[in-house]
C-alpha cells in the first residue's frame, strides 16, 4: 500500500510538472510572440528616426532606440569593398512651447566611398574655378601690372611727366654704330623716332644693307665709313649748340694709289736698255757698277773707290761712308782711309736706323739736291760679312718705309768687290796704316774666336755647331 501511495504521489507530481511545463512553455511562447510583434512594430516605426553618417542631425533622447545594422540589412556582404556605418546622434530640439505636428520626412543618407569622392572633387573644382575667376578679374583691374605686384608696393605709384627738351635743333645719337647705310642726313634728322617694336629691336642688331645707289662707289663708301668712325670718337655736342655738317676727310695716301708708279719703276729696272736704278727706283746709280758674286747687290771695283777717295765724283756724290765689317783686330791692322768699323747688326742699327739718324739723313737728302749720299760695305773678301750687313740695312730700311714704298732712307748702297785684300794690293797708299792683317792670323787666334762668337750672338746665329761652320769658312777663305 505504501508503495502504491508513493507511486500515485509521484504520478501526480509528474502530471503537475507536465502541466506546469506546458503552461510555462505556452507562456514563454506568448512572451516571445509579443516580443517579435514589438520588434516588427519597432521596425515599422523606424521611418520616424534619422540615421546618418554625419554629426549634423539631432534626435530626442526619449526617442533613442537601438537598431542593429544586421537587422536592417545595410551591411554589404563579406569581402565587399563598400562598407557602411550608421551613426545616430542625439538631436537637440529648439526650446519652443508648441511644436509643429507636421515634421519633414526623414530619410537615410547613405553614400558609398566612390560617390563621396566624386562629390568632394567636384566641390574642389568649383572652388578653384571661383578662385581663378577672381584672380583674372583682379588682374584686369590692376592697370596692366603683373599679379602680386600690389603686395610688394606699399605706396601709390606716381608717374613724372617727361622733361621737355629745350627749343632748337638737337642731335640724336644713334643707338648702334654707324655703318655704310647711314648718311649724314640720318644723323641730323630731328624727327621723333618711331616706337620700338620687337621687329625693330631685332633688326637693329642685323648687319645693315649696303647703299643701293648706283652712284655710290667703293671709295665713297670708305669715305663715309671713315667719317662715321671719327664722329664716334668725338664728344657729343650740347643740345643748344648749332648743328654743323662735318665733311668727310680726304683720302689718305695708301699703297694702292702708287701701283702705277711702282709698276713703271719695276719696268724700268728690268729694261736692259736703261741703266741700273737705285733702291727707290728714282734714278740711276752715280758710280759705275760691275758684275760681282752677289747678284742682288751692286758691286764696285777698287779703282772706283780710289777715284771716289780722290774726289773725282764730287759733282755727283755729296757724301759717302765706307763701312768696314771686319773684326776690330783686322781693322786696326790696316783699313781704307775714312772707313768705320761696324761688324754687328746692333752697331748697324745704332749708326743708321735710329730716329735721329733717319731724320738727319732725310735732311741731308733734301739739302744735297741732285747729289747723292752713298754707303759702301766691305770686309776682307766681301764674301760673307760685308754682304750680310748690306742686306740687313736694306731689308730693315725697306721695312721702316713700308707705308711709303718704294721710298728709302738709304737708297744707294754699294759693295766693294773682293774686299780690302784687293784694295790694299792696288792702292796701298790709301790705307791706314799701310798694312794688312788677315782674319786667320795665328797671333790673333783667341781674338778671332772671341769676336766670332760675339758677332754671331749679336746677329742671332747662336753658338751651337759653330766648330763645323768655322772650319768650312776657314777652308774657303784660304783658297
Curated annotation (Swiss-Prot):
Q: Where is this region: Disordered?
A: 182-218
Q: Which GO terms describe its cellular component?
A: chromosome; cytoplasm; nucleus
E.C. no: 3.1.3.48
Quote the catalytic residue positions.
379
What PROSITE patterns does the record point to? Answer: RHODANESE_3
Q: Name one GO molecular function term.
A: protein tyrosine phosphatase activity
Which family, according to the similarity comment?
Belongs to the MPI phosphatase family.
The name of this protein is M-phase inducer phosphatase
- Record organism: Drosophila melanogaster
Lineage of the native species? Eukaryota, Metazoa, Ecdysozoa, Arthropoda, Hexapoda
State the gene name recorded for this protein.
stg
